[in-house]
């Protein structure tokens, strides 16, 4: 039995729309086994127990690349801590998990870079699948139909308070509210801040991260789909967040805080309770390892 752990990811970091993503310490875990015949699912809702399952599709994609005719597959979800359609890379975790599982069945035929290309071909963009595979912050672009990326390990000087709403927001719906064209001013606004964000993490200049988190390409449009967004976002800064941004396509809000700030989580939880906003608050660290094989029992 092959077991794989894949981290949640926070894409569209601040101004890094479709290009900067980060892995955090929240996980889905999967198990895979080739069987004599058929397709068997464990720990998966009945409606997804078919050949349209995204995990199965990723595995088959990998097998097809290797021209490998598998007999049958048993696919198990051992842990599903990454919430679905919340802007934390749940679908990417399934794609990456399936590709790694298939590659292990193939005896490790493909490199991680080759698995990344497959993941991007399936997902359509690299900003979730790349950090899910490699961990840390990953800056990734598509150049001549190839993924070009660079990974940055995140030091433990900051942690990430992940504020998860009690409703789903599909990426498709969140895409529909975006403008088809942007102004030169908005493009320049984001380019400068994306560069600043990366430099902040490289040089520990977290005092600058607030300016670096600002965005003109997607957050102001998508926040209209998220009740209480402005109130919670502004409260995070009031309580001392170093930076704050909409994670992925939303609706999750990610707050970056100093690793020694002990009271922030309790204070934002109390604020949500007082306002009767039934959102979850998770205190996470950066995951610099990315997807890994699990040894022994899960």
UniProtKB/Swiss-Prot annotation:
PROSITE patterns: GHMP_KINASES_ATP (PS00627). GO terms for molecular function: ATP binding; homoserine kinase activity. This is Homoserine kinase. One of its GO terms (cellular component) is cytoplasm. It catalyses: L-homoserine + ATP = O-phospho-L-homoserine + ADP + H(+). Belongs to the GHMP kinase family. Homoserine kinase subfamily. InterPro entries: GHMP_kinase_C_dom, GHMP_kinase_C_sf, GHMP_kinase_N_dom, GHMP_knse_ATP-bd_CS, Homoserine_kinase, Ribosomal_Su5_D2-typ_SF, Ribsml_uS5_D2-typ_fold_subgr. ATP binds at residues 83-93. It comes from Clostridium botulinum (strain Alaska E43 / Type E3). It comes from the Bacteria. It is found in: Cytoplasm. Catalyzes the ATP-dependent phosphorylation of L-homoserine to L-homoserine phosphate.
């Amino acid at each position: 039995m092959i077991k794989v752990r894949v981290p949640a990811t926070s894409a569209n970091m601040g101004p890094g729309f479709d290009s900067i993503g980060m892995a955090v310490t929240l996980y889905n875990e999967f198990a895979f086994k080739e069987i004599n015949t058929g397709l068997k699912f464990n720990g998966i809702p009945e409606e997804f127990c078919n050949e349209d399952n995204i995990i199965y599709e990723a595995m088959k994609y990998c097998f097809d690349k290797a021209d490998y005719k598998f007999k049958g597959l048993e696919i198990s979800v051992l842990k599903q801590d990454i919430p679905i359609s919340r802007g934390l890379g749940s679908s990417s975790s399934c794609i990456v998990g399936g590709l790694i599982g298939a590659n292990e069945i193939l005896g490790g035929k493909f490199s991680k870079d080759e698995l990344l290309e497959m993941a991007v071909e399936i997902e359509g963009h690299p900003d979730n699948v790349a950090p899910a595979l490699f961990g840390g912050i990953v800056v990734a672009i598509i150049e001549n139909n190839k993924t070009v990326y660079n990974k940055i390990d995140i030091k433990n000087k900051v942690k990430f308070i992940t504020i998860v709403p009690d409703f789903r927001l599909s990426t498709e719906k969140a895409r529909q509210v975006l403008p088809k064209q942007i102004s030169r001013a908005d493009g320049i606004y984001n380019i400068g801040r994306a560069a600043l964000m990366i430099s902040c993490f490289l040089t520990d200049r977290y005092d600058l991260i607030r300016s670096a988190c600002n965005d003109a390409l997607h957050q102001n449009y998508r926040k209209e789909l998220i009740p209480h967004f402005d109130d919670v976002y502004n409260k995070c800064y009031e309580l001392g967040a170093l930076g704050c941004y909409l994670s992925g396509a939303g609706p999750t809000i990610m707050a970056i805080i100093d690793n020694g700030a002990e009271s922030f989580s309790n204070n934002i939880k109390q604020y949500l309770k007082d306002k009767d906003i039934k959102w979850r608050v998770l205190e996470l660290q950066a995951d610099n390892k990315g997807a890994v094989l699990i040894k022994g029992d899960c």
